[in-house]
Amino acid sequence: MFNKLMEVLMSFNLPRIRNKSELQHHTNKQSYVDDVFNNFFNEIASFSYPTHYNNKILSPRTDITENESEYHLEVELPGVTQDNIDLKIDSNILTIDGKKEQSTEKKDHNYHMKERYYGSFSRSISLPSNVDEEHVTANFKDGILSIKIPKKEQSKAKKIKIS
């Protein structure tokens, strides 16, 4: 647990003190350390569950709507290419897997902030029993994966004659 915390701490660009004047607004070294940790925990709190910063597992944001004939999902995948998306449906579980490739990191630049995520992502969504798994369609445009899942025709109750 401690190692994971240290790994997360090291992944942030903590402020570096270059000279004593940078500490003037702090009353002592402890107030500087308090500020560093407060900033760290505020940044951690800003991440929404289930996104995990240290291993960069992402869960794309999704809107799900329905009408009389189908379910419609819109999944935000900014910066992801269509070739890096895998979509499957099995036993009424829709799974979206993929990878967001990292652009070349600038070795000769010092980052002041680095908020963009890279790496693998996965999202599984349980679907109702009335979906037609054989006729699912998907389209990817402008960073939005649009998935249409038709509903099966509901079987109508038949009256049974009792003899």
Curated annotation (Swiss-Prot):
UniProt KW Translocase keyword: no
Family membership: Belongs to the small heat shock protein (HSP20) family.
Protein name: Small heat shock protein C4
SUPFAM superfamilies, A to Z: HSP20-like chaperones
Keywords for this protein: Plasmid, Stress response
Transmembrane domains' residue ranges: none
Domain sHSP: 53-163
Organism: Rickettsia felis (strain ATCC VR-1525 / URRWXCal2) (Rickettsia azadi)
UniProt entry tagged with the keyword Coiled coil: no
InterPro entries, A to Z: A-crystallin/Hsp20_dom, CS_dom, HSP20-like_chaperone, Small_HSP
